[in-house]
């Protein structure tokens, strides 16, 4: 225990963020272990891959938390460009999965490059917004252009849920930057127009929204099973491997992992998960308010928002409060791309917090 505490202190980790992340990872490992018990031929592979990605995620958090602001920006630029190129390649060169072209597939490895765009774009957007605020140059046009490129990629794949996530975080960054209303209102109008056009022309978007608003029991099998699992779980759950979610839901390891936890681990564990996410978000918000550096403020706000918004979308989908988006629960759902992206977000947050405290 002494060694662990000295390790935390020597790395300047913020315990209000790092410890909840560790707890979320542990809960996720138990959840994936439960699912892997149901898959005889992939029992060892599924849980082993998940544990490997979790360990890799912790390494990423530690390494990124040591970056200077300068190196953080350089790192983000390099990986943003790399992820953009890979994301474009998924549309033209890689086969579709469930009607979408989001994955780079090499041998037995699949990777979703748009996941890396989340933390890196937030850093670049914060940098450009800070520059525009002080110099009133072309940087805001470049910011809009980068977001427009990401939007085009996401809607082409198509990944409307990710588009909503990006836009929500980006527009809050802009509002935080105190830009003129004549700039903000046209952007909001373009978003509403994009939403309407997506509903009209993108069949998968129309299907999910219609299914959410007008579906009956037969149309909403996964959601009904998800809701049923929460009522079955009670306070303490039915025990690892004793639930029905992993048997009946093909996406129990990703989209509906929260439903599995609610059934097998109970309401108390499901509530603790929410509490951990809230603690992380509140801590990020508190630190962001003590800095006078616009770049750090926008970066912390954006990274915190994208993490909590993704959490809200996943959990709300499980509870039928939002249409299903195919979005993972950070640090809990199975998926290497998601774990790496979430780890980058937390690593970036920790290094930004360290710099904010030094001011």
Feature annotation, model-predicted:
Residues 2-24, 30-157, 220, 315-330, ...:
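Membrane-helix boundary/helix-loop-helix interface segments in multi-pass membrane proteins
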Residues 52-56, 60, 264-281, 345:
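Hydrophobic alpha-helical transmembrane segments
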Residues 77-84, 136-156, 160-200:
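Hydrophobic alpha-helical segments of polytopic membrane proteins
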Residues 88, 152, 171-172, 308, ...:
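Hydrophobic residues within the alpha-helical transmembrane core of Major Facilitator Superfamily
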Residues 97, 101-103, 183-273, 295:
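Hydrophobic, glycine- and aromatic-enriched re-entrant/interface helices and adjoining loop segments
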Residues 129, 167-183, 245-269, 328-345:
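Interfacial segments of multi-pass membrane proteins
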Residues 131-141, 183, 284-303:
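Membrane-interface helix-loop-helix junctions at transmembrane boundaries of multi-pass membrane enzymes
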Residues 288-326, 332:
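Loop-to-helix entry and N-terminal half of a specific, functionally important transmembrane alpha helix
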């Amino acid at each position: 225990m002494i060694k662990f505490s000295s390790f935390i202190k020597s790395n300047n980790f913020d315990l209000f963020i790092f410890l909840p992340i560790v707890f979320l990872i542990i809960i996720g490992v138990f959840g994936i272990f439960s699912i892997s018990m149901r898959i005889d031929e992939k029992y060892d592979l599924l849980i082993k891959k998940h544990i490997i990605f979790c360990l890799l995620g912790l390494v990423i958090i530690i390494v990124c938390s040591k970056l200077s602001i300068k190196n953080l920006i350089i790192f983000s630029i390099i990986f943003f460009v790399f992820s953009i190129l890979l994301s474009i390649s998924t549309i033209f060169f890689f086969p579709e999965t469930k009607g979408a072209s989001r994955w780079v597939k090499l041998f037995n490895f699949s990777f979703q490059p748009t996941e890396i765009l989340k933390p890196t774009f937030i850093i670049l957007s914060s940098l450009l917004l800070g520059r525009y605020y002080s110099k009133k140059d072309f940087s805001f046009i470049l910011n809009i252009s980068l977001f427009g490129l990401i939007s085009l990629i996401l809607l082409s794949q198509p990944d409307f849920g990710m588009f909503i996530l990006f836009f929500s975080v980006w527009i809050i960054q802009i509002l935080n930057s105190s830009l003129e209303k004549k700039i903000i209102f046209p952007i909001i109008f373009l978003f509403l127009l994009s939403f309407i056009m997506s509903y009209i022309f993108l069949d998968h978007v129309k299907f999910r929204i219609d299914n959410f608003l007008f579906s009956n029991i037969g149309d909403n099998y996964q959601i009904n099973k998800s809701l049923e699992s929460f009522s079955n779980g009670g306070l303490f759950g039915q025990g690892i491997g004793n639930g029905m979610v992993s048997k009946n839901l093909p996406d129990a390891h990703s989209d509906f992992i929260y439903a599995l936890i609610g059934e097998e681990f109970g309401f108390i564990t499901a509530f603790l998960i929410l509490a951990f996410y809230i603690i992380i978000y509140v801590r990020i918000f508190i630190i962001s308010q003590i800095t006078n550096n616009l770049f750090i403020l926008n970066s912390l706000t954006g990274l915190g928002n994208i993490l909590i918004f993704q959490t809200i979308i996943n959990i709300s989908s499980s509870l039928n409060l939002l249409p299903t988006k195919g979005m993972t629960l950070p640090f809990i759902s199975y998926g290497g791309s998601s774990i790496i992206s979430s780890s980058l977000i937390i690593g970036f947050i920790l290094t930004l917090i360290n710099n904010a405290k030094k001011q």
